[in-house]
Swiss-Prot record:
The keyword NAD does not apply. This is Amino-acid acetyltransferase, mitochondrial. Pathway: Amino-acid biosynthesis; L-arginine biosynthesis; N(2)-acetyl-L-ornithine from L-glutamate: step 1/4. GO terms for molecular function: L-glutamate N-acetyltransferase activity. The lineage of its organism: Eukaryota, Fungi, Dikarya, Ascomycota, Saccharomycotina. GO terms for cellular component: mitochondrial matrix; NAGS/NAGK complex. Residues 368-534 form the N-acetyltransferase domain. InterPro entries: GlcNAc_Synth_fun, Vertebrate-like_GNAT_dom. Its main location: mitochondrion.
Length: 542
């Protein structure tokens, strides 16, 4: 039914809804996989469930009339996709003016809206939203005012994080998306040349990202206050002020995301982007793209290949030669960060699995002669076997497998309650071992959601960034995804010289080194091929 609504239009009569449908279909056809399209239609096509997205606007007064006009059009497109928008303004002395500008612009585009200037009553924890009618066809424009009963006075919220935390906690509706739209875009990343982080797993990265931003703010503040820079302030002072504002607002945006997403379901998604990107009329519109696919515009686990020694640019995330990186903040790919509350991550770096550091299959394990580790530090081999078999749809011979990997385990990565796993071993010559991804599995119903695959590959690339190899069957449908994350790929049946050629059903993938120099070391290549090619699978023949 939803596809039928999107596709139905009169030939030769291009109404605004026709243009909206064409754009949405362009995004859906060019970016969404079959599974994503099915998931989207199943989710938002159900009339019994109403999904809402909160759009938090920062710096609305600074946006041009054209941008506000395009924003109203974008809200109409979001509603066409089956998600209901609620607009929240950030604290500012201009909120009343901003609210009126939005209301008038929405009205011009046939959108009904209602300004709400007392969304909460401080002390009673009751929201006016709870007492109001259901906003099925009306867009609330929520102003950040708090009514203090003791003072009998309405006041602008001083702490926007606390305001949003309380507002969202008592909203009587299902919030599926939380979008922050500002002037500068997503959370800046030094690894991306100060363009935005692609994806942030808050449960894993929030603390470190917040500390980095705080340190950058402190360092920049010292530079701005340093008397030695007085003579330079005339030339670069305004730029440093711009940097300072960007960093402080980015820190607040990160805190807002953490506070709000922690109150929502784990499947909920956050997104931070600039207003220019949010209203772009292309298939790379980050808001439409995320509603349709629930992921970022580019994958966060793609490797940073170096384009040239001067610009040090990465092929997948930086502009073409000659373009200025600073101007890319207006490009959705460079100015958008997608965030999830995320899942717990555990890393077990036991070289050998024993009865003391494992749960299950103790009859196959030896004892280390030490005290048993706490439950959270033990690898659950029963669950490990379960996810591998569920993912590969094959039976794993645990006796054969444990004999093969024990004593040379590099790391075991576990996501959540064994919803995603990676088992890495050290293979190769004793004096020159290399990290090998032996098993990689994600529960079938979670593939593509929560960005589990990207999280696992990012962890592996950070931990084994100099050298990592894995293999995959030639006909594996995931090989294109693997290829995008590798420096190179070889067929394991090729003639490597200095040894017999063997028929093989696998391809070898390699990641490592900023320039992939090891891949031109033919002696090392022979070692990769020889050792990886001859690894015996541990599948049961039953």
């Amino acid at each position: 039914m939803l596809f039928r609504r999107l596709l139905t239009t009169k030939v030769g009569y291009h109404t605004p809804n026709y243009v909206n449908r064409r754009l949405i279909l362009s995004v859906l056809k060019s970016t969404a996989t079959r599974r994503e399209a099915k998931d989207y239609l199943t989710k938002y096509g159900d009339p019994a469930v109403a999904y809402h997205c909160v759009l938090y606007l920062r710096g609305t007064k600074t946006f041009s009339a054209g941008l506000i006009n395009d924003f109203a059009i974008m809200l109409g497109r979001l509603r066409l996709l089956g998600i209901r928008p609620l607009v929240v303004l950030s604290p500012s002395k201009h909120v009343m003016t901003e609210s009126e500008i939005l209301r008038e612009t929405f009205y011009k585009h046939g959108l009904q809206s209602i300004p709400i200037n007392e969304p909460m009553a401080s002390g009673t924890r009751e929201t006016i939203l709870q007492n109001g009618a259901s906003y099925n066809s009306i867009i609330p424009i929520i102003m950040p005012f708090v009514y203090h009963q003791q003072r009998a006075k309405r006041m602008l919220a001083e702490d926007e994080v606390a305001f949003m935390r309380e507002l969202v906690a008592y909203m009587p509706c299902r919030i599926d998306k939380f979008f922050i739209i500002n002037r500068y875009g997503g959370i800046p990343s030094s690894e991306r040349h100060d363009n935005s982080h692609v994806f942030v797993n808050l449960s894993q990265e929030y603390g470190s990202l917040a500390e980095v931003l705080k340190q950058q703010i402190t360092d920049l503040r010292h530079e701005m206050d340093d008397g030695l820079l007085a003579e330079r302030r005339a030339t670069d002072g305004s730029y440093k002020e711009f940097q300072y504002t960007t960093l402080t607002e980015s820190l607040t945006d990160l805190e807002l995301m953490s506070a709000v997403l922690s109150l929502l379901l784990p499947s909920s998604t956050g997104l931070i982007t600039s207003m220019h990107s949010a209203v772009t009329n292309s298939r790379y519109n980050p808001l439409l793209y995320n509603v349709l696919t629930d992921r970022s515009l580019v994958s966060s686990s793609l490797p940073s290949f170096k384009r040239d020694p001067i610009s040090d640019n990465a092929w997948y995330e930086l502009p073409a030669c000659g373009a200025k990186i600073g101007t890319q903040r207006a490009n959705p790919i460079f100015s958008t960060t997608v965030l999830k509350q995320g899942v717990d991550i555990k890393l077990y770096d036991y070289s050998t699995l024993t009865k003391e550091n494992s749960v299950g299959f103790h009859e196959l394990l030896s004892t280390a002669g030490s005290a048993q580790l706490p439950a959270h530090k033990r690898v659950n081999l029963t669950k490990l076997k379960g996810i591998i078999e569920h993912s590969f749809d094959r039976n794993l011979d645990m006796s054969h497998y444990l004999k093969r990997i024990n004593g040379k385990i590099a790391s075991i990565i576990v996501i959540g309650d064994y919803e995603g796993i990676a088992i890495l071993t050290y293979e190769g010559p004793e004096k020159r071992p290399f990290a090998y991804l032996d098993k990689f599995a994600v529960l079938p119903h979670l593939r593509g959601s929560l960005c589990i695959s990207d999280v696992i590959f990012n962890l592996m690339f950070k931990k084994f960034g100099d050298e990592l190899v894995w293999r995959s069957r030639r006909e594996n449908v995931v090989n294109n995804w693997y290829f995008q994350r590798s420096v190179g790929v070889l067929d394991l049946s090729i003639d490597i010289g200095h040894g017999p050629k063997k028929d093989n059903i696998f391809k070898l993938f390699y990641y490592g080194g900023k320039k992939g120099t090891q891949f031109y070391d033919f002696d090392r290549l022979r070692e990769y091929i020889t050792y990886v090619r001859d690894i015996e699978p541990s599948w049961s023949r039953k």
